[in-house]
UniProtKB/Swiss-Prot annotation:
Domain of life: Bacteria
Residue stretches in coiled coil: none
Entry's family note: Belongs to the UPF0262 family.
Native organism: Bradyrhizobium diazoefficiens (strain JCM 10833 / BCRC 13528 / IAM 13628 / NBRC 14792 / USDA 110)
Protein name per its UniProtKB record: UPF0262 protein blr1257
Pfam families hit by this protein: UPF0262 (PF06793)
InterPro entries, per the entry: UCP032146
Length: 165
């Protein structure tokens, strides 16, 4: 028995992701590396089901900042528009700030600190990343269904975007 399109997740996935070049903040090689890995991992395995799309993916996603909002421009693989979601950046500001501070500490630590100190900082970094991922999942509720791993990878991409505030 086949599942109805809205329950069959085989097409509920992202096959391409782009970031708005004007939204990308300045970053060093460590952040660029994380971004490349997040995009690769996201495309390799994800669950991304826009509400109302009835499993008619796969999808492409363009992420950017417009005004004070995070923009998710979702399209079908052939470029046909599905929906554009604008999410307030407010819930992410403190999390992203904390994430960058701990990432700075982590990148400094991996060059000079003991393995125990690196592990402790990395645990804190993962905890803040998980918090951002859960916040993103909550903000997308009723708009786009994503699993936790997809949300984690999307949050990584959000952190490389630049916004004022």
């Amino acid at each position: 028995m086949t599942k109805p399109p809205e329950q069959d997740d085989s097409n509920n996935r992202i096959v391409a992701v782009t970031l708005d070049e004007e939204s990308i903040g300045r970053s060093g090689p460590d952040i660029e590396h994380e971004r490349a890995i997040a995009i690769y991992d996201l495309i390799e395995q994800n669950l991304f089901a826009p509400e109302g799309a009835d499993g008619k993916g796969p999808f492409t996603l363009h992420i950017g900042i417009t005004g004070n909002r995070l923009m998710f421009d979702i399209r079908r693989e052939d470029g046909a528009p599905v929906v554009v979601h604008l999410l307030s950046l407010g819930p992410f500001r403190g999390i992203v700030k904390d994430y960058f501070m701990i990432c700075d500490s982590y990148y400094q630590a991996i060059r000079t600190a003991t393995p125990d100190k690196i592990e402790a900082i990395d645990m804190g970094r993962r905890g803040i990343h998980d918090e951002g991922s859960r916040t993103l999942q909550e903000r997308l509720k009723g708009k786009v269904r994503v699993d936790f791993e997809t949300s984690r990878r999307l949050f990584t991409l959000i952190t490389v975007l630049h916004w004022k505030g």
